[in-house]
Amino acid sequence: MLDKMKQFKWLIIVSFILLVIPLYLTFKNSQESSTLKTAFEKQDRVEVLHYLMASEKYASQIRKAGYIIPSDGAIRLDGVIYPLEIEGDVHLKISPPQKDAKDFQLFFVTQVNDKQTYVAFVLDKDLNLIYSNYSQDNDSGKREGASISQSEEDRLLKIVRGEIDGFMENMYRILYA
């Protein structure tokens, strides 16, 4: 009789654990999804990029939207989606922002004054330019810093903002429409 009581207690404990774990995982997943939707609605692009790129969770939806990301195996190996590529007027490569970051980095190559120019931007959540860097290959093939006019920088920033805003709209539509 004592053995049956002990087995019954273990059965209750195991059943409880098997019930609680899926409920906890469902709650956590729901909470994360809610946080992402809130970030979209606040237009906090840094937070949205962090949640989308922090793991392979949204990889299939990003691919479905037509964006280029590494294979699932590479994402699992790196722990993040790096890079997220947006092909448009310029081919953006976005680095994943850290949790609670205030900015994010992106890179692309474009033509400035008939020379191939490598561009790095650091943008905040409102897509304001925090930092920019430009480089070009010199005649001997070494990359060196370059400068561009303010109007050219403004033109490039406008293109980048349009591409990122388009990405945000597409992802919101795919995830929540």
Report the location of each language-model feature.
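Extracytoplasmic electrostatic interaction patches
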Residues: 85-177
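N-terminal export/targeting and maturation segments
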Residues: 24-98
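Generic surface-pattern signal
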Residues: 10, 41, 45, 53-58, ...
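Short, Lys/Arg-rich N-terminal segment immediately upstream of the first membrane anchor
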Residues: 1-7
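Hydrophobic membrane-insertion alpha-helices, especially the h-region
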Residues: 9-25
